[in-house]
Amino acid sequence: MQSSSPSTSHCSQIPIKIQHHIAKKRQVRRRRVDLDCGCSYYIHLDCINHGFTHRGVHHCASSNEWRLYLRDNKSPIFHDNQTQPTTIQQQIQFPNISNQVQPQLEEGTGDSQMFSQLPHLDDLTVSDWSFFKSL
């Protein structure tokens, strides 16, 4: 006897309850990270390029972010958490140039070249104003 189903594959579909049961048994791929303050958190292994701040300290969750955070000079594996990093303040040196202000053009009360063709604003009709408002 032929099947009334138009499908050519006659495999049975797994019930949703069974699928959920299998998914609950599957191990979550995550790794535990212990922080210096005594706190710990878990990060999913597929989660990359995410960092966060905890108690005022920025924590990186990816090697790329560590390298950026350490300015590419030291691998995060060899990062020594015992020593306090010295703060390097770079002061930007601006040349001390006095009296070199670029002069501005004076404002005039006459027509500019761009608006010389426009009629006086008092001469505009209601239809002109409605046209401008529709723009």
UniProtKB/Swiss-Prot annotation:
It is found in: Host nucleus; Host cytoplasm. A zinc finger (unnamed) spans 37-54. The keyword Zinc-finger applies. A motif (Nuclear localization signal) lies at residues 17-32. Keywords: Activator, DNA-binding, Host cytoplasm, Host nucleus, Host-virus interaction, Inhibition of host innate immune response by virus, Metal-binding, Phosphoprotein, Suppressor of RNA silencing, Viral immunoevasion, Zinc, Zinc-finger. One of its GO terms (biological process) is symbiont-mediated suppression of host innate immune response. It holds the Pfam family Gemini_AL2. The keyword Lipid biosynthesis does not apply. Phosphorylated. One of its GO terms (cellular component) is viral capsid. Residues 120-135 are annotated as: Transactivation. Coiled coil: none annotated. GO terms for molecular function: DNA binding; structural molecule activity; zinc ion binding. Its main location: host cell. Belongs to the geminiviridae transcriptional activator protein family. Monomer. Homodimer. Homooligomer. Self-interaction correlates with nuclear localization and efficient activation of transcription. Monomers suppress local silencing by interacting with and inactivating host adenosine kinase 2 (ADK2) in the cytoplasm. Interacts with and inhibits host SNF1 kinase. Binds to ssDNA. May interact with host RPS27A. The zinc finger and the transactivation region are involved in PTGS suppression. Multifunctional protein that modulates host antiviral defenses and promotes host attractiveness to insect vectors. Acts as a suppressor of RNA-mediated gene silencing, also known as post-transcriptional gene silencing (PTGS), a mechanism of plant viral defense that limits the accumulation of viral RNAs. TrAP suppresses the host RNA silencing by inhibiting adenosine kinase 2 (ADK2), a kinase involved in a general methylation pathway. Also suppresses the host basal defense by interacting with and inhibiting SNF1 kinase, a key regulator of cell metabolism implicated in innate antiviral defense. Inhibits signal transduction by the phytohormone jasmonate, making the infected plant more attractive to aphids, which are the second host to play a role as a dissemination vector. Acts by binding to ubiquitin precursor RPS27A, thereby preventing ubiquitin degradation of JAZ. This is Transcriptional activator protein. It comes from Tomato yellow leaf curl Sardinia virus (isolate Spain-1) (TYLCSV).
